[in-house]
């Protein structure tokens, strides 16, 4: 059983992380001040320095947590062997929706990790490579046609997710389910009329 002091410390640290995420998302890194983070968290400035060495340290922790969460998620979304053709689009829909749900979970952290992070471009490249590996494995299982260059597909998917997150998800205009359905309809069924989609 954790001590009361240990629990309180964890709660204070979490409040600081949440407050910092909100401040960074609103003001950006350079305009955010430690004094505003502690004010928003309802704590004192000395308490901030018990948990974080600097504004840079808390910013970096938010980014690293986001990157780690998204990377683990990407790696976990590999389609299993033995799916029937009709189940592939349902599983892809579920996977894309899961990604959008993850990004919608904490919009402030998503804004920081995906857009404000100076390393965001490299992080998206890393995610695209992990996604490419998944897609190539799924291609070998016969789920997608063999002529597709999965590196291009992965880059397109990351680009779509990034832009739709910025335009619709973070603004609350569309929810994860509807965005996922639109992405999957486009990628799986294309733009030509066929009479079937994932709705």
Name what the model sees in each region:
Residues 110-115, 139-186, 194-199:
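Hydrophobic/aromatic-rich alpha-helical bundle segments in the mid-to-C-terminal region
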Residues 61, 72-105, 157, 180:
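Hydrophobic alpha-helical connector segments
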Residues 52, 114-119:
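Short helix-capping/turn signature of helix-turn-helix
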Residues 68-71, 75, 94, 102, ...:
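Amphipathic alpha-helical packing segments from all-alpha helical-bundle domains
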Residues 1-11, 195-199:
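N-terminal intrinsically disordered/low-complexity leader segments
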Residues 12-21, 37, 62-70, 131:
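Generic hydrophobic, amphipathic alpha-helix propensity
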Residues 4, 15, 23-57, 61:
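Helix-turn-helix
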């Amino acid at each position: 059983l954790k001590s009361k002091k240990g629990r309180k410390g964890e709660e204070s640290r979490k409040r600081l992380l949440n407050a910092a995420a909100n401040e960074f998302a609103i003001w950006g890194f350079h305009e955010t001040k430690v004094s505003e983070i502690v004010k928003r968290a309802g704590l004192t400035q000395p308490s901030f320095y018990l948990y974080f060495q600097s504004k840079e340290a808390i910013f970096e922790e938010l980014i690293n947590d986001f990157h780690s969460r998204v990377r683990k998620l990407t790696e976990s979304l590999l389609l299993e062997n033995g799916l029937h053709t009709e189940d592939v689009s349902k599983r892809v829909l579920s996977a894309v929706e899961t990604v959008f749900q993850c990004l919608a979970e904490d919009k402030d952290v998503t804004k920081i990790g995906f857009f404000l992070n100076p390393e965001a471009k490299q992080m998206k490249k890393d995610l695209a490579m992990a996604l490419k590996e998944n897609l190539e494995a799924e291609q070998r299982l016969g789920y997608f046609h063999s002529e597709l260059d999965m590196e291009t597909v992965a880059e397109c998917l990351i680009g779509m997710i990034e832009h739709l997150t910025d335009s619709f998800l973070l603004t609350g205009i569309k929810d994860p389910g509807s965005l996922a359905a639109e992405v999957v309809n486009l990628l799986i069924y294309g733009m030509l009329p066929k009479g079937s989609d994932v709705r």
